[in-house]
């Protein structure tokens, strides 16, 4: 358990539990320089993690959920699962809450609720690429407020790195079963972006009660299937698939 501490100017990942069970991170403040790799909280291949009431301002990702990369992590096969993130405030950073790109051991059963993102490059970000393998599934996001988002409010990207096409195999990452509801966004460049692989589309996505103002670009959906939208409003216009 880590509670009630303040950490400043970490030169690399600040809090990085690995292969742990029953982790509580509560009421901590992280204030790092705007430098690469100064992530805030990065649970990796952990189970039963509860992150709450934290205030994070960093130069990279604020909270990132990982499970190792490529063949070694696939052999170990230790997922990051049963993760709860609630009542946190994310300020500067590349992403507010991020999954990946190191997710080869899989990530599942993540709940993000009652969080504020103000000034991050992206809000919710799930990223991977060919060669990683692994599955990201059963992700729930609810009651999130975002403002001053420089890029995407929500981005799921299976082409995070440019890799040549290849047949579907254990090296192919999968994103599925992501539900986002009760999200309010003001001042963002791209509202929602989802890019799957030709051989592995992003699937089974539910977007509900999402209200976005200020998007300078349209929503982007490539190689996606079974997307359900209900009351998704961007600049006063309802978005439908």
Question: Positions of the model-derived regions?
Answer:
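Extracellular/periplasmic carbohydrate-active domains that bind, remodel
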Residues: 1-241
């Amino acid at each position: 358990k880590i509670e009630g501490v303040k950490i400043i100017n970490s030169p690399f990942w600040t809090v990085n539990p690995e292969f742990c069970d029953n982790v509580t991170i509560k009421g901590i403040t992280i204030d790092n320089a705007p430098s690469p790799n100064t992530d805030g909280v990065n649970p990796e291949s952990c189970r039963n993690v509860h992150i709450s009431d934290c205030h994070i301002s960093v130069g990279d990702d604020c909270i990132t959920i990982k499970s190792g990369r490529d063949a070694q992590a696939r052999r170990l096969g230790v997922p990051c699962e049963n993760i709860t993130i609630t009542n946190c405030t994310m300020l500067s950073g590349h992403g507010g809450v991020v999954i990946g790109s190191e997710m080869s051991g899989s990530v599942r059963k993540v709940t993000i609720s009652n969080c504020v993102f103000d000034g991050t490059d992206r809000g919710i970000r799930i990223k991977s690429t060919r060669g990683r393998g692994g599955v990201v599934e059963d992700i729930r996001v609810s009651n999130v407020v975002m403002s001053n988002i420089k890029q995407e409010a929500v981005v799921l990207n299976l082409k995070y790195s440019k890799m040549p096409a290849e047949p579907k195999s254990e090296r192919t990452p999968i994103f599925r079963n992501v539900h986002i509801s009760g999200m309010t966004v003001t001042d963002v460049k791209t509202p929602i972006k989802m890019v799957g692989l030709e051989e592995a589309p992003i699937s089974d996505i539910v977007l509900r009660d999402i209200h976005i103002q200020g998007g300078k670009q349209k929503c982007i959906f490539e190689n996606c299937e079974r997307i359900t939208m209900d009351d998704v409003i961007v600049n006063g216009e309802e978005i439908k698939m």
